[in-house]
Amino acid sequence: NTDEYDGIEFELKGNYQQKNRSTILCAARQLGISRESIIKGMATVCETTGLTGRWQTLGTQPLVICDTGHNAGGWQYLAEQISQVECDTCRMVFGMVDDKDMDAVMAMLPKNATYYWTQAETKRAVSSTVIMAKGKEYGLNGTPYPDVISAYRAALTDAASTDFVFVGGSSYVVADLLTRIIQKTT
C-alpha cells in the first residue's frame, strides 16, 4: 500500500509515471529505505540521476513538453495525456526510428494537430518525408524538416502563447533537441 505517499511531489510528471511510482515505492520499502529518503528521491529524481526527456516542460507560453516515448506501449499513455492538454493548437514535432511500429504509433497520434515531421541525427532515423507520407495515411498533416532543431524552431515560430508544442516520437529526437538547447545556453 502506497497511500501514505499520495501527497508526495514526484518530479517525473507523465501520467504513466503513476504506475512507475507505485513500483518504486514498493521496492524502496522492501529495501528498507527511509520515508525521508524516499520523499527526497521522488522530488529530485531528475537532478539526482540526470534523467531528462520524460514529460519534461521546456516552456510555458507556449507550453512546450518533450517526451522520449517511442513505442506503442508508451504512446498509449502519451496520447491520453496529450489529449488532456488545454490549448488552442497542438503542434507536434515528431520523428521515429526504423525499428519501431510506426503504424501502431501513428494510429494513436492526435488528428487535430499540426505536424512538424523531423528526423534525428542517427542512421536509424526514418526520413521526415517518409514519416510525413505515413502520417498522411492516418490523416495527419504537416511539413517535413531535415532536422529536429529546424522543426522545433518552426513550431515555436508558428505557435501562439496559448498553443501546445510537443517534441517526441523517439528518444533520439528528444536527445537532439535537448543537446541543442544545452549547447545554446552554455
PLM-predicted stretches and their roles:
Residues 63-64, 105-164:
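C-terminal helical cap/extension that packs against the catalytic core
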Residues 94-97, 167-171:
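Glycine-rich beta-strand-to-loop/alpha-helix junction loops that act as flexible
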Residues 170-186:
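Glycine/aspartate-rich loop-and-adjacent alpha/beta segment that forms the canonical ThDP
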Residues 31, 82, 135, 159, ...:
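Active-site catalytic pocket residues across diverse enzymes, especially alpha/beta-hydrolases
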Residues 98-100, 123, 150, 173:
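Surface-exposed, flexible loop/turn segments at secondary-structure boundaries
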Residues 4-114:
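Nucleotide phosphate-binding/pyrophosphate-handling subdomain across enzymes
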Residues 75-76, 102-104, 127-128, 176-179:
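Short glycine-/acidic-enriched loop or helix-start segments at secondary-structure transitions
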